[in-house]
């Protein structure tokens, strides 16, 4: 099952319910989709790209419009509203812009609706194809018997299907290689323990769960061969990914363990540097409560950024649908991705 899809309406796996329950929910309007994005029912940069595109298609169908001009104005407002939900993941903006630009070419209400949905469906198919290509290129970096440490969730739940970092693992396993995975729990929302472990176990891939603070000891003991993570935005000097990724990269570099980032071209924002990126800050309750249980004083000060920048100097290579890119990135990224 895809993480997000159109079936007479916008459907998505509610990732807040996993691993206890696999539940598909329907977003009936843009407000419901925005809420799903904010509460992380749908998350992961490529999945958000699809959500942004499908959001424009949804906006075109959520009510009746007097004429095509009224519909187009509504779509522009919906685009701005959806873009405001999460400021760091650039893919969301890419998906919104693609579907909006396609829709605005329509000359009638029905044509606008059709063009928006067609572009969203096209984008979703492209995501699956590029993840497969990424997986094939990345699998060449893995040896039979490798243990891969990953952080957060960059699997099929974070994409339309197959995954980026976990797509590399899946492709290697599909080739007949024996690959084991160490998954970091990824505090505070535990995407690693809840989502990565769940989907790898569903696929029968060997996975061991550790706390984030155990990264050092598993590397020190020689239990990790490679690190592969995903990305929410890649700029000229850094990779923005789930908070804690930077720490993993530092420890991996200290132990001379290859640190790979798997991400599609749409995740690259090559005109910007780390200082230009707004890092989303999540609600303080995410640290004070674990589920419904209080685990910290209610009035404690909280700092809860969702992402951190990993300097590109810590990254061994970037795995993309166009191939594996090695340093110097300032030369090779534009060359390979044709920026």
Curated annotation (Swiss-Prot):
Q: Which InterPro entries match?
A: IF-2B-related (IPR000649), IF-M1Pi (IPR005251), IF_2B-like_C (IPR042529), Initiation_fac_2B_a/b/d (IPR011559), M1Pi_N (IPR027363), NagB/RpiA_transferase-like (IPR037171)
Any keyword Isomerase? Answer: yes
Q: Site described as Transition state stabilizer, positions?
A: 152
Q: Indicate yes or no for the key word Transport.
A: no
Chemical reaction(s) catalysed: 5-(methylsulfanyl)-alpha-D-ribose 1-phosphate = 5-(methylsulfanyl)-D-ribulose 1-phosphate
| Amino-acid positions noted as binding substrate in the UniProt annotation, renumbered to this chain | 43-45, 86, 191, 241-242
Q: Report the GO molecular function annotations.
A: S-methyl-5-thioribose-1-phosphate isomerase activity
Q: Which UniProt keywords apply?
A: Amino-acid biosynthesis, Isomerase, Methionine biosynthesis
Query: Which NCBIfam families did the record assign?
Result: eIF-2B_rel, PRK05720.1, PRK06036.1, salvage_mtnA
Its job:
Catalyzes the interconversion of methylthioribose-1-phosphate (MTR-1-P) into methylthioribulose-1-phosphate (MTRu-1-P).
Q: Which family does it belong to?
A: Belongs to the eIF-2B alpha/beta/delta subunits family. MtnA subfamily.
What is this protein's record name?
Putative methylthioribose-1-phosphate isomerase
